[in-house]
From Swiss-Prot:
Reaction(s) catalysed by this chain's protein: (2R,3S)-3-isopropylmalate + NAD(+) = 4-methyl-2-oxopentanoate + CO2 + NADH
Cofactor binding note: Binds 1 Mg(2+) or Mn(2+) ion per subunit.
Gene behind the chain: leuB
Protein name: 3-isopropylmalate dehydrogenase
Record organism: Rhodospirillum rubrum (strain ATCC 11170 / ATH 1.1.1 / DSM 467 / LMG 4362 / NCIMB 8255 / S1)
Binding-site residues, Mg(2+): 227, 251, 255
Length: 370
């Protein structure tokens, strides 16, 4: 009998509720077939939360997130709230507060190319076919949070903008541990990325990751400067297995890697916190794509990135590799059969909507399970 686990669903804005509804169908199928015992609570976040509760993230929702075994988020934001709200009430602030209050410091951004979609990439098919890279980005430190920061007036009439790139040892070590552990479950290769040639924070990063590498003799550790890494991702992306890097470089490199795949509608992500004594981590999972308000409510959204985010949850929060593989292989199956939502549509393929993609995925899962 599977152990009961609590998941908090935060559908959010735009296409969020539609894509999350398809995840609920996948989860219900896993529950009904006796593979899992998930309990779901629903709450509001982003613009939907502001409209109903006057804040992009209510304290009660934070409490639910802290009590849950994992959080799954749809999407937040949209033009409805962009111009009218002060910065601290914008939908995206709800997401940032969630990450902060859950103490999520490691952002996992996989860049996978399914064989059926290899031609959608802007790179040559042979460069990206079979690509499976995982970028681990430090999420709560570095230049986005370092002090001092700000814009000040100078005596000569000019203005000065200051941001501070700063990392302490523990911030580097904890995210590097996540990356080493991931590499151990994948291809046993880890590339640490910084600018140790010109930045002291990068030099400290390299020294600490190298020291930690002694605890992981089975992992082949390499180091690369961030500018070279960006070039290599475009030149020969399949040389990488797991990449670990800081907040700024991770922000840039993960978006670079995302476009190797051809569609943001296919990309999941995870954000992880520290492990407790039992090895459990606070975690939030979400698709990389935005809320796409222009197609919301029209059954046009691609649910696969959110479904693949749920697959990451199965794998990394609940250690259910077999169930995660089932979901991943079902996604491969429906794509191989030529089913496409509008964002990944190609001539000669079959156009389906959000619900139609969900129908096909459930049928594929049932077929694979038998």
């Amino acid at each position: 009998m599977p152990v009961s686990k609590k998941i908090l669903f935060l559908a959010g804005d735009g296409i969020g509720p539609e894509v999350m509804a398809q995840v609920r169908r996948v989860m219900d199928w896993l529950n009904q077939t006796g593979r899992t015992a998930f309990e779901v609570e629903d709450a509001l976040v982003g613009g939907a939360a502001y409209d109903a509760q006057g804040t992009p993230l209510h304290d009660d929702t934070v409490a639910l997130a802290l009590a849950a075994d994992a959080v799954l988020l749809g999407a937040v934001g949209g033009p409805k709230w962009d111009a009218s709200l002060p910065f601290e009430l914008k939908p995206e602030r709800g997401l940032l507060r969630l990450r902060k209050d859950l103490e999520l410091f490691a952002n996992l951004r996989p860049a996978m190319v399914f064989d059926a979609l290899a031609e959608a990439s802007t790179l040559k098919t042979e460069l990206v076919s079979g690509l499976d890279v995982m970028i681990v980005r430090e999420l709560t430190g570095g230049v986005y949070f370092g002090q001092p920061r700000g814009i000040s007036a100078l005596p000569n009439g000019e203005r000065r903008g200051v941001n501070t790139q700063v990392y302490d040892t523990h911030e580097i070590v904890r995210v590097a541990k996540v990356a080493f552990d991931l590499a151990g479950k994948r291809g046993k290769r880890l590339c640490s990325v910084e600018k140790a040639n010109v930045m002291e924070s990068g030099l400290l990063w390299r020294e600490e990751v190298t020291k930690l590498g002694a605890d992981y003799p089975e992992i082949a550790l390499s180091h690369m400067y961030a500018d070279n890494c960006a070039m290599q991702l475009v030149r020969q992306p399949k040389q990488f297995d797991v990449i670990v890097t800081d907040n700024l470089f991770g922000d840039i490199l993960s978006d670079c890697a995302a476009m190797l795949t051809g569609s943001l509608g296919m990309l999941p992500s995870a954000s992880l916190g520290a492990a407790d004594a039992a090895g459990n981590r606070r975690a939030m999972y979400e698709p990389v794509h935005g809320s796409a308000p222009d197609i919301a409510g029209q059954d046009k959204a691609n649910p696969l990135a959110t479904i693949l985010s749920f697959s990451m949850m199965l794998r990394y929060s609940f250690d259910l590799a077999e169930e995660a593989d089932l979901v991943d292989n079902a996604v491969r199956g429906v794509l191989a059969k030529g089913l496409r939502t509008g964002d990944i549509f190609q001539p000669g393929k079959t156009l389906v909507g959000t619900t139609g993609m969900g129908d096909a995925l459930l049928a594929e899962m049932a077929q694979l399970a038998n």
